[in-house]
From Swiss-Prot:
Assembly notes: Homodimer.
Protein family per UniProt: Belongs to the shikimate dehydrogenase family.
Official protein name in the record: Shikimate dehydrogenase (NADP(+))
Residues binding shikimate: 19-21, 66, 91, 107, 231
Functional note: Involved in the biosynthesis of the chorismate, which leads to the biosynthesis of aromatic amino acids. Catalyzes the reversible NADPH linked reduction of 3-dehydroshikimate (DHSA) to yield shikimate (SA).
Catalysis performed (reactions): shikimate + NADP(+) = 3-dehydroshikimate + NADPH + H(+)
Amino acid sequence: MISSKTSFIALIGNPVSHSLSPIMQNAALQYLGLDLIYIAVPCKDEDLELVLNSFKKINCKGLNITIPHKEKVLTLCSEISPIANKLKAINTLKLNSEKKWSATNTDVEGFIYPLKNLNLAKKKSIVLGSGGAARSVIQGLINLNLSTISVISRNKSSLDELIKNFGNEIQLQGLLNSDDQAQVLIREADLIVNTTPAGMKTTKYKNNVMPYGETFWRSLNSQTIVYDLIYNPAPTTLLKFSARKGCKTIDGLEMLVAQGIKSLSFWTDGLEVPFHVMNDALKKYL
């Protein structure tokens, strides 16, 4: 029962109306018997610092950070984990003993979760998009030992910055979505991962669209695994299209749960819940 002593954890982003995190996190908090609730708070770019400073002064125990704040929030944190610092992208914060924000990134572990048993070592992959989520995905693909990682984006400046971020750790190929070479890569890819918001179910985005338009996908073959980080709607228009082509498809739900478990552990100093607790809550809701 919520009381005057109840603390909260919040999801900060814009938009957040589509988020399923409150469903699964509140199920987990109830499972653990903690006097905590999880809420979603819409936050515009210009309000981010004000919101984070305000939350320091009330019963906030931690935050999830989502689009479009994963990179900007770096400057507002006093402690940053090695993985978050490397990726320059943050999705989880907690208040430390000095009432300052400590930050980490649980997206890499979440992203890998559905791929662990698919034997993708030495395979070819494409990442669509060049924002904060793409950084986590690329790190995950490096961890899985894929041989080729190509990044396709419509934003040249963020694409160049993304490739620079990984330096000499792996040879990344960057292309604009209008480049003819993209069709060759799509035809040969073993795995394609969408990190763009195209297809997300919100008032801000149309959910019946595909990343870069349907003609961009004309060379997709049935042997390719298509992984869309979007989890609402599930399946997305992209995954429906890919399934009709005969592709194996993966939506963002397993990643959402897996990263959520790691975030919860970060907020609670090591407590964990079984995967099924969050997953069952989502399935019941959906």
